[in-house]
């Protein structure tokens, strides 16, 4: 009976999938659970369905969880600007001022804030992963009254000296072209084999990635989002102004954004807390769900115990 009740409670917290227009962009989102709002921001090319469902369900037992597709991914709006070539991306990473992307990370942060405001929410706990961590950092630095707490997972500060991928990962990504739909799943799994930690579960990843690819496939959007990252400035100085309680999480086996990215992020944000998980790479292994969710809840509680945020 207890198991049946638990299963029923998890099914009931999956409540609403909808779309709203903000900043001239249609944003697909999903709301689960009840409680204080918590916004999940996905990484490069990821969709809202790329958050492990069990992780979302467990969070939704404590928060009103809002996850969404960034612009140029999933079921949100796609840019009509042609995707950059591989050479243009390399050039942009070497010299950010040489490119003019259709949008930057700042625009993506404004999308997230616009979604909150469209949902009639003044603020939320902000949790971002990888590129989503970069977006979350910009929200916390630029909109302190909208940020109850910040959790930046396997991300960096934009300082190109910190969190650099390993040479092997760089070489592997550089060798790849843009896969067609029939190849995309195998290419995704091959990448996770490179960047995932020892606790990464290939079967779970394959099932989740296959479902996301069936939902939407936009390789050009991945290139444009990559260009947005390359064109966005170092956030280190801005992060020194963050006042929200902050948790920084990184896997010690991350080869895509190496652990120095998390260390630099924690060093830049006053009074932040840093957790480095062994056996975790650039992934969210189920084995860390309990510890990660507990840490997120603890950080959120710091917000409730803190003095009022600046106006």
What are these language model-derived features?
Residues 122-161:
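Conserved hydrolase catalytic core segment
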Residues 253-257:
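Acidic catalytic loop of the alpha/beta-hydrolase fold
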Residues 272-311:
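Catalytic active-site module of serine/aspartate enzymes centered on a nucleophile-bearing elbow/loop
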Residues 150-179:
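Flexible "cap/lid" loop of the alpha/beta hydrolase fold
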Residues 182-224:
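Conserved alpha/beta-hydrolase catalytic His-Asp/Glu region
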